[in-house]
Design a protein with these regions (language model features):
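Dynamic "connector" segments at or just before major functional cores
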Residues: 1-125, 143-162, 170
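Short, flexible loop/turn motifs enriched in small residues
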Residues: 134-140, 149
Length: 191
């Protein structure tokens, strides 16, 4: 008999579910193609942010000791900041293209713009603009494109708060052209 040196209890259910979703949707494969050296860290941080939505990334060290996750090791808060900063626009667009191609034939794309009010005086994109709530705070606009059936987002863009929805849609159509999408079905709301 071999003596037991260490015992450990780890949570795996949610990670297993996310692993399967990542495989079925192509998210894991597309992340691996676009971020070959860091995709496991990205997945681990995504799992954490979904499961611990109210906790800051500084708590990842504690969480990762109790949960099985793709990276399998700690990602200190400073390293996660560096990881997010290292993501280049070219890589991000490549990921969006890959995800969009998986959805283009199968479903309509839904597009929505939301405003996020802010008191920040240092963020360049925080500007005075119009919003549905009619609050007169500076804001940033977030444009999101997602599969209508799957509900999976595969494109986002942060925009200055003073950019109108019409200009945003024109920019989106230009970006579709750049990404090689010639014929797409997009659902928009009247907002």
């Amino acid at each position: 008999p071999v003596p037991i040196n260490k015992t450990q209890r780890s949570f795996y259910g949610a990670s297993y579910l996310f692993d399967q979703i990542g495989k079925l949707t192509g998210v894991e494969a597309d992340l691996k193609a676009c971020f070959p050296d860091t995709y496991k860290k990205i997945l681990s941080l995504a799992y954490y942010l979904i499961l611990e939505e109210n906790n800051s990334l500084s708590r990842f060290s504690h969480w990762q000791r109790l949960h099985i996750h793709p990276h399998g090791k700690d990602i200190p808060s400073q390293r996660s900041s560096e990881l997010f900063q290292s993501i280049e626009e070219k890589e991000r667009v490549s990921f969006f293209e890959k995800q969009g191609k998986r959805r283009i034939e199968k479903e309509y794309w839904a597009f929505d713009i939301t405003t996020i009010s802010s008191y920040s005086e240092v963020l360049k994109q925080v500007k005075n603009g119009k919003n549905k709530e009619n609050d007169h705070l500076p804001q940033i606009n977030l444009a999101l494109l997602f599969g209508e059936e799957s509900g999976l987002p595969f494109y986002y863009r942060k925009l200055p708060g003073n950019i109108s929805d019409v200009k945003t849609v024109k920019q989106l159509m230009h970006e579709f052209d750049v990404m090689g999408y010639r014929k797409v079905n997009v659902i928009l709301d009247r907002g």
